[in-house]
């Protein structure tokens, strides 16, 4: 089971792909209008390994939320508690470079509490397409296999990849 903010983009606008394609249960958690998730609400939704319930394995957070930068201290605290409860923590950071510019925090500071982070190169950076999954080697290896199984590969994409590299090297501050 995945715990996720009820109004987060991944929960609302991705056609429940995790459930449909991955067989993963989704447990939406209420968030404030600014996207903040209450720690107690998150803790109360974590299920133990009981045959009556889906086992909670992942907390998915989002920064930014509807253009609003989430307080880093809140995200870090949610991740810390989730890790203590043996959950992995993923950050949907599609527009994380916007949070980087707004807060002045380094990308390392914005991401160090998470096991994996997804970043979009076309949202705010000007690349025509492309996303990054940032994680340890074990997670990346699993992601490569899943991408292959789902047909998510492209061939001869050097030109497109070079646009993403250019965006990372030149467009963050703009």
Question: Which residues fall in each region the model found?
Answer:
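Conserved PLP-enzyme active-site core in the AAT-like
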Residues: 1-174
């Amino acid at each position: 089971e995945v715990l996720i903010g009820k109004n987060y983009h991944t929960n609302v606008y991705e056609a429940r792909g995790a459930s449909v394609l991955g067989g993963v249960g989704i447990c939406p958690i209420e968030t404030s209008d600014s996207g903040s998730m209450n720690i107690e609400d998150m803790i109360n939704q974590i299920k133990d390994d009981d045959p009556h319930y889906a086992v909670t394995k992942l907390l998915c957070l989002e920064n930014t939320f509807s253009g609003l930068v989430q307080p880093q201290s809140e995200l870090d605290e949610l991740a810390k508690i989730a890790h203590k409860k043996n959950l992995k923590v993923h950050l949907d950071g599609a527009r994380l470079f916007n949070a980087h510019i707004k807060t002045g925090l380094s990308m390392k500071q914005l991401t160090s509490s998470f096991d994996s982070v997804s970043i979009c190169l076309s949202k705010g950076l000007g690349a025509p397409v492309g996303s990054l999954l940032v994680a340890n080697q074990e997670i990346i290896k699993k992601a490569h296999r899943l991408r292959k199984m789902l047909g998510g590969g492209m061939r001869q994409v050097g030109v497109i990849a070079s646009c993403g590299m250019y965006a990372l090297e030149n467009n963050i501050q703009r």
